[in-house]
From Swiss-Prot:
Transmembrane stretches, start-end: none
Record has Glycoprotein as a keyword: no
Name of the protein in question: Leucine--tRNA ligase
Species annotation: Roseiflexus sp. (strain RS-1)
Keyword Aminoacyl-tRNA synthetase assigned: yes
List of residues binding ATP: 666
Pfam entry (one): tRNA-synt_1g
GO biological process: leucyl-tRNA aminoacylation
InterPro entries to which the protein is assigned, alphabetical: aa-tRNA-synth_I_CS, aa-tRNA-synth_Ia, Leu-tRNA-ligase, Leu_tRNA-synth_edit, M/V/L/I-tRNA-synth_anticd-bd, Methionyl/Leucyl_tRNA_Synth, Rossmann-like_a/b/a_fold, tRNAsynth_Ia_anticodon-bd
Keywords: Aminoacyl-tRNA synthetase, ATP-binding, Cytoplasm, Ligase, Nucleotide-binding, Protein biosynthesis
Similarity section: Belongs to the class-I aminoacyl-tRNA synthetase family.
SUPFAM superfamilies: Anticodon-binding domain of a subclass of class I aminoacyl-tRNA synthetases, Nucleotidylyl transferase, ValRS/IleRS/LeuRS editing domain
Length: 904
């Protein structure tokens, strides 16, 4: 067979070409940062993962998006930093290790090796020389350094607090790690409340900056910024100090010396004169002291119940109000009235001060509570044109009006502006020394202590006299010791490692005990992007020069689920480091892209027990609460339909229950391992499916049809350009740059339209439409090649340019086509094509013909036709003439290049 004949049989994409190109990229360092000295820089980063072992296709989307963008900027001549690492400490690794009976370290490093293999076979190219693993001492040493920095600045502190306790994982959780239903972010267990000594980072000191600087992030999704604004939760109002009298105090006598100040934050200080009782959160530290002896049993039982409830349950608007009177009273500072003090679960310790002054006439929750327990309702705002009566009101009035029964602010209109009630009340409180205007936040300090083994040891020493001091910096890292028993027991497993816990204070030589808690894994991820700038530095966390060179991250890519966890913490730590002069800007990520998920239907075969009779498998029965008894096929179909499933018949006669699209995961059983898929189909096929199926911010469904479509596209590229590769290469080398004429003109125009569209779409993350444009160009090139019957300069130019345009999306085939076109070296050194604006000018344009503004026909006309020519063609057009008839033409409106409207 002749060589030409052999080449003509090249009609499909062969995935076996991929390994040689991956080896080539690694050998040549194509994607190593610093390769192009002096070139403009880009830092592109995907959120690093927990090492969970062999990756499935669902994991790939995040990385494929980042890789496509990286390849685009590399071929454009940028010096790109695209690093990778492993978020290896924390509960996910430890729980999995416990489940499989392996040490967390062994499990973690084994999974890192497997995951890395999957990424490499998928053709995701990183600068592996900057790889970080957070459980390595050379990384967590700097976690400890960061802790000591915050400690010196007064931003790390230890305090007793009511904390979220996960009874399954046996550890505390930050507020951000408890979902809206009061469940743990990892175990799903109902979170309990406990009083414990814990370490905190004072993120609230940065609350105002974290809030205001969201306005600078104009390339972040609005929904992420809104979530952070709501979580920070800024409120303006006043702090007012009530005086809580001890139980049994004489209500008519002056307050005794042991009366307790009770600080309240309110956004409506103008309604203080309407307060008829006070409510404390069940966790309030003064609640036990203010409880009368005869009420103690009831109060303690109520507090115990409240600790078991989630915040969303406690604050539900539809829930019947509950509470207990403590048996003590407080003095309202604006009128010296004695009002009863209650505890109720609708007041949260985590917001404001954990105490409220209740104004039932003007707050619906307080109103419902007052009606439930027969407490007085006093009106202090009268709405326009109405007269409210506290005894007959059926709901609170929270709206506008005029202040009444309010002493010095009577008659003032309600509002927060100048001359309105809120500012007037604050001015009066400050003048009287009874309160002050203030701002408060929903945001609470970041609780970083964890009572688990697999984490960064906290570098603090506990001395015999009860004091706590930091480990000197030159003693870092405090190494995580090897222990035999790392199962959770409610206190850190490190506490049992006596050989490690008992140490010597290096500064005094006195005995000391190490802190036995470990750090929240979100500390590890709060600064890892900075370590990538200088990952091999063993003298400092990173150099200022490296940070100036690369920071901030130009494009960050990851899931929206991290909006109020990782992303908020990373912004906080970056601001702290900026204040220390270590980083050039106080925001870590210029642009954020949140990708959608990869979904796939779950298919579960049913057991056929007799002709026309089936039984649901046990796992499906449990999951969907289906009957155990055998069902007819129609009964089974109906039961599945009620649960959002369909029943499909297989080619072998079997029956399968098919779910709707479900996020791909190991637990759902619908993951496709990366390795076997890539070996069979090629990573370029996987990449095209992921990038083409839907806009990347949306979730996409992985289907067999999508895989087949991606294969067809790549096969057509091979079939079109492969057989002619020698002729194409020769013509590209000859460099015929003459402007195309005649039949070549349409392909040349389509080529430059495609360059423009792929360029703009790639920069806007519209990968699906960029690939669609390449498919259109392929169609046009195929039509042209069939009609012309030979390789021409414009066809050769199209092939060479196509390889470069394809390179972000199907990089292995792009390199192959580039080599067919005579390219030496990598396609990523060939440069991104520029479009020719003059090529986009059409020879002919479509002109719409109208009569009295209604469409009556269309004609093709030369692009430069003047008004007179267009007018003449319109007035002689048979379709136009048939609608004009014998009517007089009053005027002709011509819009060159677009339309002619004949008015009769």
């Amino acid at each position: 067979m002749s060589e030409t004949g052999a080449k003509r049989r090249m009609d499909r994409f062969d995935p076996s070409i991929e390994p040689k190109w991956r080896e080539f990229w690694a050998r040549e360092g194509i994607f190593k940062a610093g390769r192009r000295a002096g070139a403009p820089r880009r830092y592109i980063l995907e959120m690093f993962p927990y090492p969970s072992g062999d990756l499935h296709i669902g994991h790939l989307k995040n990385y494929v998006i980042g890789d496509a963008l990286t390849r685009y900027y590399v071929i454009r001549g940028y010096d790109v930093l695209h690093p990778f690492g492993w978020d290896a400490f924390g509960l996910p690794a430890e729980n999995a290790a416990i489940k499989y009976g392996r040490h967390p370290r062994e499990w973690t490093y084994s999974n890192i090796a497997e995951s890395k293999k999957s990424l490499e076979i998928a053709g995701i190219m990183y600068d592996w020389s900057r790889e970080v693993t957070t459980c390595n001492p050379d990384y967590y040493r700097w976690n400890q350094w960061l802790f000591l920095l915050l400690y010196r600045k007064g931003l790390a502190y230890r305090a007793k607090a009511t904390v979220n306790w996960d009874p399954v994982d046996q550890t505390v959780l930050a507020n951000e790690q408890v979902d809206a239903e009061g469940r743990s972010w990892r175990s799903g267990a109902k979170v309990e409340k406990r009083e414990l000594e814990q370490w905190f980072f004072r993120i609230t000191a940065y609350a105002e900056r974290l809030l205001n600087d969201l306005d600078k992030l104009d390339r972040w999704p609005e929904n992420v910024k809104t979530m952070q604004r709501n979580w920070i939760g800024r409120s303006e109002g006043a702090e007012v100090t009530f005086l809580a009298l001890p139980p049994g105090a004489d209500l008519y006598a002056p307050p005794p010396p042991d009366a307790e100040p009770l600080v309240v934050f309110t956004t409506r200080p103008d309604t203080l004169w309407g307060a008829t009782f006070m409510v404390l959160a069940p966790e309030h530290p003064l609640a036990p002291k203010l409880t009368a002896p005869e009420r103690r049993a009831e109060v303690e039982a109520y507090i115990a119940r409240a600790r078991m409830e989630s915040e969303i349950e406690r604050t539900s608007a539809t829930r019947e109000k509950s509470g207990v009177f403590l048996g003590s009273y407080a003095i309202n500072p604006v009128n010296d009235e004695r009002i009863p003090i209650w505890i109720a679960d609708y007041v949260l310790m985590g917001y404001g001060t954990g105490a409220i002054m209740a104004v039932p006439a003007h707050d619906q929750r307080d109103f419902e509570f007052a009606r439930q327990f027969g407490l007085p309702v006093r009106v202090v705002v009268q709405p326009p044109g109405e007269t409210l009566d506290g005894d007959t009101m059926t709901e609170a009035w929270p709206g506008d009006g005029v202040m009444v029964n309010s002493g010095p602010i009577n008659g003032i209109p309600v509002g927060k502006g100048e001359g309105q009630s809120v500012k007037a009340a604050i001015a009066w409180l400050e003048a009287q020394g009874k309160g002050k205007g203030t701002v408060t936040y929903r945001l609470r300090d970041w609780l970083i202590s964890r009572q688990r083994y697999w984490g960064t040891p906290i570098p603090m020493l506990h001395l015999p006299d009860g004091t706590i001091k930091p480990v000197p910096e030159d003693q870092l890292p405090v190494l995580l010791p090897e222990v035999q028993d790392y199962l959770p027991k409610g206190k850190s497993p490190l506490a049992a490692a006596e050989h490690w816990v008992n140490t010597i204070d290096p500064e005094t030589g006195q005995p000391a005990r190490r802190d036995t808690d470990t750090m929240d894994t979100f500390v590890d991820s709060s600064w890892y992007f900075l370590r990538f700038c200088d990952a091999q530095n063993d003298r400092e966390i990173f150099s200022r020069e490296a940070a100036r060179q690369w920071m901030p991250v130009d494009q960050y890519i990851g899931g929206v689920e991290h909006a109020i966890l990782h992303l908020l913490y990373a912004r906080f730590i970056t601001k702290v480091l900026y204040d220390e002069g270590l980083v050039p800007e106080d925001e870590p990520f210029k642009a954020l892209f949140t990708q959608g998920m990869v979904q796939r239907r779950v298919r579960t075969p049913l057991d056929i027990v007799a002709p026309g009779m089936v039984r649901f498998p046990e796992e499906l029965r449990r999951k969907l609460e289906l009957p155990a008894e055998a069902q007819t096929v129609d009964q089974a179909r109906a039961l599945l339909k009620e649960r959002g499933y369909t029943l499909e018949e297989e080619s072998d006669g079997g029956l399968t229950a098919v779910s709707g699209p479900v996020t791909m995961s190991k637990s759902a059983g619908n993951g496709i391992p990366v390795g076997p898929f890539v070996r069979q189909y090629g990573s370029d096929v996987a990449r095209i499916v992921v990038l083409f199926a839907a806009p990347p911010e949306n979730s996409m469904e992985w289907t067999d049809e999508g895989v087949a479509g991606a294969q067809r596209f790549l096969n057509r590229i091979v079939a079109l350009f492969g057989p002619d590769r020698d002729e194409i290469a020769a013509m590209v080398r000859s460099g015929n740059g003459a402007a195309p004429e005649g039949e070549d003109r349409a392909l040349y125009r389509k080529l430059h339209e495609t360059i423009r569209k792929v360029t703009l779409d790639t920069e806007q993350f519209r990968f699906n439409t960029a690939i669609a444009a390449l498919m259109e160009l392929l169609n046009e090139a195929s039509r042209y090649r069939a009609e012309v019957g030979r390789v021409t300069p414009v066809f050769a130019q199209t092939a060479a340019t196509f390889a470069r345009l394809l390179s972000p999306f199907a990089p292995h085939l792009a390199e192959e086509v580039h080599s067919w076109c005579g390219g030496t070296g990598s396609v990523y050194d060939a440069g991104w094509p520029e479009w020719d604006e003059s090529a986009l000018v059409l020879d002919e344009v479509e002109i719409v013909l109208q009569v009295n503004g209604k469409l009556r026909g269309k004609i093709m006309a030369p692009a430069g036709a003047d008004e007179e020519q267009l007018r003449e063609w319109a007035l002689t057009n048979p379709r136009v003439l048939s609608f004009v008839g014998d009517k007089t033409v009053r005027k002709v409106i011509v819009v060159p290049g677009k339309l002619v409207n004949v008015v009769v």
